[in-house]
Amino acid sequence: MSAKSRRPGTASSQTPNECVQVVVRCRPMSNRERSEGSPEVVNVYPNRGVVELQNVVDANKEQRKVFTYDAAYDASASQTTLYHEVVFPLVSSVLEGFNGCIFAYGQTGTGKTFTMEGVRGNDDLMGIIPRTFEQIWLHINRTENFQFLVDVSYLEIYMEELRDLLKPNSKHLEVRERGSGVYVPNLHAINCKSVDDMIRVMKVGNKNRTVGFTNMNEHSSRSHAIFMIKIEMCDTETNTIKVGKLNLIDLAGSERQSKTGASAERLKEASKINLALSSLGNVISALAESSPHVPYRDSKLTRLLQDSLGGNSKTIMIANIGPSNYNYNETLTTLRYASRAKSIQNQPIKNEDPQDAKLKEYQEEIERLKRLIAPQQQQRSEKQGTIKKQRVKKPKKEPISQELIGSALQASSADLQVDEDRDSDGDGAESESDKENEAEVAKSNEELERERVENAKLAAKLAELEGQLVRGGKNLLDTYSERQIELEKKLVEIAERKKREIEIQQQLELQEETTLEIRERNVSLEQEVELKKRKLSKCYAKYLALQQELNDCKHDHNQDLRELEMAQNELVKELKRQLLIIDNFVPIEVKQRLYTQAKYDEEQEEWKFSSFPLPLPPSGGDGRQGYRRPVSHPQRRRPTSEHALQEAKSNAPSSLRFKSENIVSYELEMPCRTTQEYRTPKVSASLQAVLAQAMQTGGDDIDIVDSHTNSLRSRLENIINANSSSNGGPGSGAGPLAANTAGSGVGSMPNVRNIKSSRGLPSAGTALDSNRRPPTGRIPAKKPASAYPKARGLVNK
């Protein structure tokens, strides 16, 4: 690190503290911004490390905002310049045994992925990650008397979940913490032996990374990607081991829904991304203000960056910004957070002889395998010597058998059979001895074959372990020439010199005002007044800038305070509600036992209960063990509110959840009707008219008694007159009836019967047609009330 990165601060007795190195890079204007005519609001001065931001909308009200960083690069800066001046020294420190971290921070669409990964297939546009691979293997190839073990891992944080990009279908990953720092167990690591292997791993991970389309970026990263490189180095002369770890982080950009047009799944991703970046901003603010509590556990991203921010690491933060006025607010926020990160101090420590170094384990395993193979090879050589001796003795018996066969052929024919039997016995004895020797040889060959297979397996395992260890100092002339190595050294020296120049320039600007009066001599009062005016104008401009900065800080502070107050009010309200439920619906013994058994798990960030069995509740007055009823209602079987009681009385579908016994009550369902209403038989219209006229009593009931003969006579006359008028006009056929009526006694009922019978009226069952007139001389008369069923009641009355 340069001297400029070691700002004043507390220093350890062993290793001085180092501040986070902050670099700002501004991308060029996009085609869309040019077509829309958006003005540029960012001015970058690389020779001083200064970035100026001007609000063109309120140029009269707001002053230019000036920010100073360790380095600043405009749109014309190349990838090679950025790497050699900023990243190259950090990677060299990692190769010496330190921990390093490089992460790109900024708004979406500002070139973070381009800075970290670059363009594939173009050497000039390669990003930081592939250039890091080349520097690592260049160092390995030209370092002698060292063994190296290089492992790489690749993961992403998507929707606050860790995913292994090298094993997409792996199980869920968690962040753990131990004495040496934060780590991710069960993360797949791949051993690499060259630059091509590391590039191949990076391509595999990039294919599995989550990207999406937004209005601000066609290939927007929807997750935070972390490429981890672990380099173990062993000095073969002193047998000391050093471990360097490098984390290359490509953060997803912060975004606003109104600008990106995110919806559905993209909107959920944006909310999680903004939440993680907000947590990162809170961590940076807490570290910059030396707060006693740093909220590392607010997100998975801050947990993984715990060592990089304020821990055992050398860190570079590359803040990417856009020059357009369209992104003014986002650019201002990024510059402020980057300015705060300058004051974060880390404590880098060289990792020497770590306990978890794989290189040490591999060396011990190689020595063990060599010790196993050596005696087996010696035993194998001894067995091969004995087998050769046995094979030499075997051919000596063959001439003996040939002589016996020759003598048997020269014998007589009489003794031929005897000689053949003897020869066969001799051949059988020799064949048995040969078979025994062959069995021993076969057995020895089998044992040797098994040992050979075992030795081959051990040798293959040994070769595999030795193959993973890369020995330095090989193929140096084939990779880089001496002139190229010297050129790289010169580039590093130039980068260091440029950093020192920027530091000196910044110090001169700070001391310029204090030395202004000493350097300038006043000749007259007018010149003194002019100098005072210029000094006053500068001071006033600084005052306005500081006042604007103070107002912005107050606005941001008030906004954060309001958000915190709202969150606190919601939490307090929820806490009171939960406590109210516990106090009124949970027995006191249960509540006390739960409070004593609850433990907070810092790894899982949640409360858990101990697994030991719960004690029995205290016994009551009757000797039975049981809980006391809650204070809500001790008589009921369960606590019930007044609203639940009212709802339980109703039979609405929504009231089922308020039933105390969980029994559904329904209305009675009536069966289908099997009977019908009685309907009177239909009567013809003419008969209905006659019956209706007969039933008209004129307001009085028909009383057929001796005391009402006068009324009965008058009514009968009215009926007869009406019938006569309808048949033959007035007075027709009325003479005989009137005479008979007049001549009869007034109260004599038999006279009425005589009148009805003398006219020959039809019976009740005879149907009358309304179109047919009754026969001449017959006047229809009304029957007595007793003849009609409906009139019987009137007659009785």
From Swiss-Prot:
Residues 417-431 have a biased composition (Acidic residues). Residues 371-450, 610-656, 722-797 are annotated as: Disordered. Plus-end directed microtubule motor that may be used for anterograde axonal transport and could conceivably move cargos in fly neurons different than those moved by kinesin heavy chain or other plus-end directed motors. Residues 19-344 form the Kinesin motor domain. InterPro entries: Kinesin-like_fam, Kinesin_motor_CS, Kinesin_motor_dom, Kinesin_motor_dom_sf, P-loop_NTPase. It comes from Drosophila pseudoobscura pseudoobscura. SUPFAM superfamilies: P-loop containing nucleoside triphosphate hydrolases. The gene is Klp68D. It comes from the Eukaryota. Residues 432-450 have a biased composition (Basic and acidic residues). PROSITE patterns: KINESIN_MOTOR_1, KINESIN_MOTOR_2. This is Kinesin-like protein Klp68D. One of its GO terms (biological process) is microtubule-based movement. Residues 350-384, 432-580 form a coiled coil. ATP binds at G106, Q107, T108, G109, T110, G111, K112, T113. GO terms for cellular component: cytoplasm; microtubule; microtubule associated complex. It is found in: Cytoplasm, Cytoskeleton. Residues 782-791 have a biased composition (Low complexity). Its main location: cytoplasm. Residues 386-396, 626-638 have a biased composition (Basic residues). Keywords: ATP-binding, Coiled coil, Cytoplasm, Cytoskeleton, Microtubule, Motor protein, Nucleotide-binding. One of its GO terms (molecular function) is cytoskeletal motor activity. Belongs to the TRAFAC class myosin-kinesin ATPase superfamily. Kinesin family. Kinesin II subfamily. Pfam families: Kinesin.
